[in-house]
Amino acid sequence: PVLTVWDGNGAMYVAEMRSYMQDENGTGTKTLRNGRIKKLVDLNGDGRMDKATIFVDNLNLPRMILPLDDWIAVRETDTMDVIAYRDTDGDGVADENKMLYEKGPYSRNGPKTSVEHQDSGMLWNVDNQIYITYNMERYQFTDGTWRAEKQPGHWTQWGLTHDDYGKLFWIDNTRPLKAAQFHPKYWKT
């Protein structure tokens, strides 16, 4: 498991990179497509997850999940595309999907981009913008439409969160914590 998010109904979604670095050479890491997202639910309100289903399967190292109404937005490794999935019959397995944002292969550092040197995060902030790490874009999801806009600065690939006022905090390989003291809406683009 590499990432956990909750939807508005308390269901937990867990991204699993099942092929990540299974040996010292990384054999199959980006080719096996055995990543998945599990959905866990508490059926009786006791705070313990009673049911787990494989919500989406056969993914290429899923690295971002964001609940949107009754959809779950997902981005995989080596692509900038965002695909939304939903379960329409209540069995806990996604049976419908749609492309929210199509931008094609991830190529920030060339075609052989490292698994670590790619975006993650997908954090919905209080300014109604969706922030990700490492890439200089942020997104907005309104009326079923996913829009991207450039933002200044360089993030990190490891973690992103915000406080109650919308200040962004992130970490990287050399410093334990960084923060944006001014909200990104005040940054020049």
What positions do the PLM features span?
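Beta-propeller domains with acidic blade repeats across secreted/periplasmic ectodomains
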Residues: 1-189
